[in-house]
């Protein structure tokens, strides 16, 4: 297990943003994205980190970005620190395995969610309305059922500490333009269906996931992260049983623990027991090993 990285401080690099998990440095023509071991739940960053989480997220993203290059280009220039600008080299011990040098794209103002199974907020929506985000679904579906076809449900990109809001496809057209919105929807569904089939052979069900896209040199590319346990619901195929919630290889384990507490889901976060931190880390690492065949 490597040293926990909760935050980075590189005085001679320009910090552009600090998100819930990632620290982003502006290197001029490019960006340096460092994935820390921070973890958030219900849009609140926990005080404790998850050992090796940044490594797992970076390696899983790189795996999926490579798999999807026949569908869409991505923002990665390199994940090898030796390829990074010289100003980054002195921080190699922190950056190794958890960072990416990426193209500086203009992000689209929407997050692109695809759901192949009915779970989480989608299940609540369906129980109340028979639809998910306004998309009518067949009657009689059970929690965690596979949907007849994957559905595309975009959302707004919320500021740090606030919640994303689901939007209609028509609203996405307003935000991004018709041609871009339609292309994003088509690409998102294609990526998901390819990934679902790959994951299936490795014993993982990808129930739903979230993508971000940007424009680089006039071209649509995929940015941020790609089908990690932070942006997706991963379920073990061998124990899949619709009709209730599923065990998972993602932070659902942490969310489930937090639901047992008398906590109002706003900052400050409650302290996490060592066992919850350890088990969450094990679930993340298990996802990496199952998907790529390699741990750390």
From Swiss-Prot:
Database matches in Pfam families: SAICAR_synt
Pathway recorded for this protein: Purine metabolism; IMP biosynthesis via de novo pathway; 5-amino-1-(5-phospho-D-ribosyl)imidazole-4-carboxamide from 5-amino-1-(5-phospho-D-ribosyl)imidazole-4-carboxylate: step 1/2
Signal peptide: none
Biological processes per GO annotation: 'de novo' IMP biosynthetic process
Taxonomy, superkingdom: Bacteria
Alphabetical UniProt keywords: ATP-binding, Ligase, Nucleotide-binding, Purine biosynthesis
Top-rank EC class of the record's enzyme: ligase
Reactions it catalyzes: 5-amino-1-(5-phospho-D-ribosyl)imidazole-4-carboxylate + L-aspartate + ATP = (2S)-2-[5-amino-1-(5-phospho-beta-D-ribosyl)imidazole-4-carboxamido]succinate + ADP + phosphate + 2 H(+)
GO molecular function, one term: phosphoribosylaminoimidazolesuccinocarboxamide synthase activity
GO cellular component assignments: cytoplasm
Enzyme Commission number(s) of this protein: 6.3.2.6
Family per similarity comment: Belongs to the SAICAR synthetase family.
Name the record gives this protein: Phosphoribosylaminoimidazole-succinocarboxamide synthase
Organism, as annotated: Geotalea daltonii (strain DSM 22248 / JCM 15807 / FRC-32)
């Amino acid at each position: 297990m490597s040293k926990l990285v909760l935050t980075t401080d590189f005085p001679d690099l320009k910090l552009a943003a600090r998100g819930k998990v990632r620290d982003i440095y502006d290197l001029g023509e490019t960006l340096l994205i460092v994935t820390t071991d921070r973890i958030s739940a219900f849009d609140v960053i926990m005080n404790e980190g998850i050992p090796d989480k940044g490594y797992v997220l970076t390696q899983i993203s790189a795996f999926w970005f490579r798999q999807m290059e026949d569908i869409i280009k991505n923002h990665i220039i390199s994940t090898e620190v030796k390829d990074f600008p010289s100003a980054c080299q002195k921080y190699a011990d922190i950056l190794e395995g958890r960072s990416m040098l990426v193209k500086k794209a203009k992000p689209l103002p929407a997050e692109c969610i695809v759901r192949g199974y009915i779970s989480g907020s989608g299940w609540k929506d369906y129980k109340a309305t028979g639809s998910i985000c306004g998309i009518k679904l067949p009657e009689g579906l059970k929690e965690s059922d596979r949907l007849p076809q994957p559905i595309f449900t975009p959302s707004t990109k919320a500021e740090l500490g606030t919640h994303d809001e689901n939007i209609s496809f028509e609203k996405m057209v307003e935000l991004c333009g018709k041609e871009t919105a339609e292309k994003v929807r088509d690409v998102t569904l294609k990526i998901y269906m390819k990934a679902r089939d790959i994951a299936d052979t490795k014993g993982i069900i990808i129930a739903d996931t979230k993508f971000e896209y940007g424009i680089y040199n006039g071209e649509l590319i995929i940015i941020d992260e790609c089908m990690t346990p932070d942006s997706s619901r991963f379920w073990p195929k061998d124990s899949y049983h619709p009709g209730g919630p599923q065990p998972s290889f993602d932070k659902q384990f942490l969310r489930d623990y937090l639901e047992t507490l008398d906590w109002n889901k706003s900052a400050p976060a409650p302290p996490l027991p060592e066992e919850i931190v350890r088990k969450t880390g094990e679930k993340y690492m298990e996802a990496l090993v199952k998907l790529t065949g390699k741990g750390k």
